[in-house]
Amino acid sequence: MRMRIRNQNNHLHFPVAEAGLSPTHFQADTFPPSFRKRITVQHDGIDTDLVAPKPDAALELDNGAKLTRDDEVVTFINRNLEPYRGYHIFMRALPELLKKRPNAQVVMLGGDETSYGARPPKGKTWKQIFIDEVRDKISDQDWTRVHYLGRVPYDRFLSMMQVSRVHIYLTYPFVLSWSLLEAMSAGAAIVASDTPPVKEAMVDGETGMFVDFFDQVSLVEKTCKLLDDAALRQKLGTAARQHIVDQYDLKRTCLPKHLEWVDQLAKQPVLGPDQFIS
């Protein structure tokens, strides 16, 4: 019943819709065939001129310290830190990652609310729930290398991506995060969950490395592999950026296609009420 109620908006609008737009095939393919055939897949686009590698980038932490590309920085981003985007998996892998990487600085970005999945018990946050779950497995000294930024202005987000040595992206089969594409555009080396929306944007071994969503051991192993191999990081990061420039560039690819879609739609004859597909 809950799902039917959530779908009512689409059911009310699609019978009178002549066309639809979806940023990904994964999202478009969630619609019934009668709706899907009218949906054009075209991503919003990434400003690859703005979101680009920056060798002299620096990220200032809340404690005043600055991280640069000379530091071993591991990054993780959610709009809000929650299980739907793999926060719990990342946190459960964190104790072992910190043990194996004594010089790593782990930087996490995201709010304390809930964007997509189930809400935490009243009075709690998913962020703190999973901190509490793993904190006794992490020494006080190692915990000083874990940095929560909360929500930040866009320029600070960009700096975080530009200093990242390895970026970790995890998600259930759901809407693809724009931050993954921005990380690729920034030339980051990425370890990402082997889930359908991710596979639409990345190729394992070519533009990033895949890991089973629930496999914390493999997540740590592949992150360490990238941290140990500068040449592999460079190869994957360069290919990831080129893919975004070729397929997702806002100004040269996506925006022109959006305008073309609008122009073609405007040229179609206006349908009468009895001509729409139910």
Which role does the model predict for each range below?
Residues R151, S159-S164:
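Short alpha-helical donor nucleotide-sugar binding micro-motif in glycosyltransferases
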Residues Y172:
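Aromatic "clamp/platform" in nucleotide-sugar-dependent glycosyltransferases that forms part
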Residues D204-G205, M209-Q216, K225-A230:
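Conserved acidic donor-binding segment of nucleotide-sugar-dependent glycosyltransferases
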Residues T114, A118-D155:
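Nucleotide-activated donor-binding/catalytic signature segment of Leloir-type glycosyltransferases, i.e.
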Residues L21, N63-R85, M91-E96, V106-L109:
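Conserved donor-binding/catalytic core segment of Leloir-type glycosyltransferases
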Residues M1-G20, P33:
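Membrane-proximal helix-turn-helix segments that form the acceptor-binding/catalytic region
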Residues A231-K267:
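A charged, aromatic-enriched C-terminal amphipathic alpha-helix characteristic of glycosyltransferases
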Residues A189-A192, M202:
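Short hydrophobic beta-strand element within catalytic cores of glycosyltransferases
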